From Swiss-Prot:
It comes from Pyrobaculum neutrophilum (strain DSM 2338 / JCM 9278 / NBRC 100436 / V24Sta) (Thermoproteus neutrophilus). It comes from the Archaea. The gene is rps17e. The lineage of its organism: Archaea, Thermoproteota, Thermoprotei, Thermoproteales, Thermoproteaceae. It holds the Pfam family Ribosomal_S17e. One of its GO terms (cellular component) is cytosol. One of its GO terms (molecular function) is structural constituent of ribosome. This is Small ribosomal subunit protein eS17.
Length: 71
């Protein structure tokens, strides 16, 4: 099982994804750069955790859209 993310990681990730949905992809490296540009996050660890959470959300949305299209 994976780790549970703190609320501040989820809320920041959700806010960034809502404000800039076209800036994020299913690539962690690209999302990491986008988070660094869009948000003022002082620590690398928090930036990476937010980018990882956003990557997971984008992948989940794509899989859900693919499943709905197949059904």
């Amino acid at each position: 099982m994976g780790r549970v993310r703190p609320r501040y990681i989820k809320s920041l990730g959700d806010k960034l994804l809502e404000m800039y949905p076209d800036r994020f992809t299913d690539s962690f490296e690209e999302n990491k750069k986008a988070v660094a540009q869009l948000a003022d996050i002082p620590s690398k660890r928090v930036r990476n955790r937010v980018a990882g959470y956003i990557t997971r959300l984008v992948k989940r949305r794509k899989a859900q859209e693919k499943a709905e299209a197949a059904a």
